[in-house]
């Protein structure tokens, strides 16, 4: 909803990099899916990915925070399709991913810089230790 052209370009560059590293084809999904991409290998779906590009270094914050609604949808897609659902994040100094089924804590919060009451909701806090590296980025 709030993505601009620069955000989408950065996201596309990241998913292209990851797709090359993992030898998968990734396709942008319609907004109705609530997850950014589906990934295929040899014409078979292997998983879904939410893609985020951050402007700070890994470890700036103690956890990675994402909406509970997003996590629930990612898990539902993985269960229904017998595939994986992952969160791919590029920080300024590294790129990593985590399985949406990783342990997390739930706290209320969210963004407060857009004056949108819908930005405050239950949020999942994933410990950074759950992230695995991708490539050498």
Model-predicted regions and their roles:
Residues 54-73, 77:
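Mg2+/Mn2+-dependent nuclease catalytic core
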Residues 37-39, 43-57:
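Conserved catalytic cores of phosphodiester-cleaving nucleases, focusing on short active-site segments
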Residues 96-137:
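Intrinsically disordered, low-complexity terminal regions enriched in charged/polar residues
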Residues 5, 61, 80, 86, ...:
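N-terminal targeting/trafficking signals and adjacent low-complexity tails
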Residues 31-35, 93-95:
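Short acidic/glycine-enriched loop/turn segments that link adjacent beta-strands
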Residues 28, 48-50, 86-90:
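A structural signal for short, well-ordered beta-strand segments and their strand-loop junctions
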Residues 75-104:
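Nucleic-acid nuclease catalytic cores
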Residues 1-31:
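Acidic-basic catalytic patches of nuclease active cores, encompassing PD-(D/E)XK
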């Amino acid at each position: 909803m709030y993505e601009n052209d620069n955000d989408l370009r950065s996201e596309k560059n990241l998913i292209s990099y990851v797709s090359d590293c993992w030898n998968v084809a990734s396709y942008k999904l319609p907004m109705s899916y609530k997850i950014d991409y589906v990934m295929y290998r040899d014409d078979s779906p292997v998983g879904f990915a939410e893609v985020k590009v951050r402007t700070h270094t890994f470890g700036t914050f103690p956890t990675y925070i994402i909406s509970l609604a997003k996590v629930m949808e990612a898990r539902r897609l993985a269960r229904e399709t017998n595939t994986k659902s992952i969160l791919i994040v590029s920080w300024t100094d590294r790129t990593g991913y985590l399985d949406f089924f990783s342990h997390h804590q739930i706290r209320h919060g969210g963004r407060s810089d857009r004056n949108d009451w819908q930005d405050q909701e239950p949020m999942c806090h994933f410990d950074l230790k759950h992230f695995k590296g991708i490539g050498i980025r």
